[in-house]
């Protein structure tokens, strides 16, 4: 059974800072992460993801989306869904009123 622990942004930043400051003491970044993760109380993989995200946010890393870009993308996708829903409602209303007008003209 896994436990979900939410860490505050300060704890996350401190953990990433500890990894970055301690890299010279270990053979690899993964070794650094594996030694620091138990001290923080998270899994090494969770800490690795945080370090990678920090690297992307500060201009390094593998070219993934920064946190701000990810947030903006999420907002744009939400807006896109709402606009599609609105267009669908307008399309259905237009069809309904066109049919009503056609029926009115036909009955004359």
From Swiss-Prot:
- Record has Repeat as a keyword: no
Gene Ontology terms for molecular function: DNA binding; transposase activity
Asked if the keyword rRNA processing belongs to this entry, the reply reads no
Q: Which GO terms describe its biological process?
A: DNA transposition
Transmembrane feature ranges: none
Alphabetically list the UniProt keywords. Transposable element
Membership in a protein family: Belongs to the transposase 8 family.
Protein name, per record: Insertion element IS629 uncharacterized 12 kDa protein S4062
What organism does this protein naturally occur in? Shigella flexneri
Lineage of the organism: Bacteria, Pseudomonadati, Pseudomonadota, Gammaproteobacteria, Enterobacterales
């Amino acid at each position: 059974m896994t436990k979900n622990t939410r860490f505050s942004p300060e704890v996350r930043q401190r953990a990433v800072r500890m990894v970055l400051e301690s890299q010279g003491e270990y053979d690899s970044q993964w070794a650094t992460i594996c030694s620091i993760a138990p001290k923080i109380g998270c899994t090494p993989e969770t800490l690795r993801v945080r370090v990678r995200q920090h690297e992307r946010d500060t201009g390094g890393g593998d070219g993934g989306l920064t946190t701000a870009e990810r947030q903006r993308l999420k907002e744009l996708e939400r807006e896109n869904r709402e606009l599609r829903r609105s267009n669908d409602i307008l399309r259905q209303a237009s069809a309904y009123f066109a049919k009503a007008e056609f029926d009115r003209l036909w009955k004359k």
